[in-house]
Regions:
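Residue-level detector of the transmembrane beta-barrel scaffold of outer-membrane proteins
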Residues: 44-46, 103-105, 168-170, 230-232, ...
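Residues on the lipid-exposed face of transmembrane beta-strands in outer-membrane beta-barrel proteins
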Residues: 47-51, 75-81, 87, 146-150, ...
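Bacterial Sec-dependent N-terminal signal peptides
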Residues: 1-42, 47-48, 275
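Transmembrane beta-strands of outer-membrane beta-barrel pores
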Residues: 49-55, 108-114, 152-154, 173-179, ...
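Predominantly the C-terminal beta-signal and adjacent terminal strand-loop region
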Residues: 40, 56-60, 65, 212, ...
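Short glycine/proline- and aromatic-enriched beta-strand/turn motifs that initiate or cap beta-hairpins
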Residues: 37-88, 272-276
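Short loop/turn motifs that connect adjacent beta-strands in outer-membrane beta-barrel proteins
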Residues: 38-41, 82-101, 154-166, 225-229, ...
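Extracellular/periplasm-exposed beta-strand and loop segments of Gram-negative cell-envelope proteins
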Residues: 60-66, 113-143, 178-212, 244-266
Length: 276
């Protein structure tokens, strides 16, 4: 019976998360359609894949082993509103600075990172060191959001020139649904307090998951592949408004080293196709 209850409970969490994602996607679609009707623009769609370095309560801040070890993979789908070109008339829009230098990006993305404790404290041959080495985790995050991208060079000129480069800066907000799995490989797992690093007692770990807002900031460039397609490369920083994304959260009032919420750094590349 316990197994059935756990299964149904997890199933309920997945269904609730799916409903929220569908609702947010409908809001984004509605916003895009509204802006299309009011302003007129063309559409671009694409996909990307890349690596993620997850910075969390696992490991030690500014430690190479932590930075190199707690890495995962991210994938995503993107949609762009291109204000420089109107699809309905197959013509350029009025030449304004905004139309020629900004795009709005909508995104659905997913990243997953397996997490471990690295660094000087986990390397110690003590009970505390063994507790840290045995503690593992995984952060799985689904994002829905938008960002505004600024292109310093002319979007019109880039669109008309094969082989051109178009650097950009981006800033936006995502709503993030996270699922974490924190556990210990020691007999009895984290249910046995003797297996838990003291600074995570009594309630500094969780596998419940949840959702939170996050802010994203990026720098990247596009490369004009053909008249209707681009490649793009992007380095992105994402900061969550929660410290539970990784499943660990030491009490910041007691442990001053817990200075920031969870965040990650993405590097990915992708392909973009112009629909109109």
């Amino acid at each position: 019976m316990q197994f059935v209850f756990i299964y149904l409970s997890d199933n309920g969490k997945i269904l609730a998360m799916t409903k929220k994602i569908k609702y947010l996607l409908m809001l984004l679609l509605g916003a895009n359609l509204s802006m299309t009707a009011q302003f007129g623009f063309s559409h671009e769609v694409g996909a990307f894949v890349g690596g993620v370095a997850f910075q969390s309560d696992f490991g030690v801040r500014h430690d190479f082993k932590t930075n190199a070890g707690n890495t995962g993979i991210g994938v995503g789908l993107v949609h762009y509103m291109n204000f420089a070109y109107r699809a309905e008339c197959n013509c350029y829009t009025p030449e304004t600075y905004f139309n020629d230098h900004f795009k709005v990006r909508s995104e659905l993305s997913y990243n997953s990172t397996k997490l471990e404790h690295f660094g000087e404290f986990a390397d110690k041959q003590t009970l505390a060191g063994a507790q840290l080495r045995a503690m593992k985790g995984e952060a799985k995050v689904t994002d829905v959001g938008m960002q505004l991208e600024y292109f310093p060079l002319s979007i019109r000129e880039f669109t008309a020139t094969d082989g051109a480069w178009a650097p950009f800066l981006g800033l936006g907000a995502h709503y993030s649904f996270f699922d974490n799995n924190t556990y210990s490989t020691l007999p009895g797992g984290l249910g046995n307090p003797n297996n838990v690093y003291p600074r995570y007692l009594p309630d500094g770990f969780s596998s419940e998951g949840g959702s939170t807002w996050s802010v994203v900031s990026s720098v990247g460039t596009r490369y004009k592949l053909t008249e209707l397609s681009d490649l793009f490369f992007e380095l992105r920083w994402q900061y969550y408004f929660s410290d539970w994304v990784d499943g660990l959260n030491k009490n910041p009032d007691l442990w001053k080293e817990n200075k920031a919420n969870d965040w990650n750094l993405w590097f990915h590349f992708g392909y973009i196709y112009y629909l109109d």
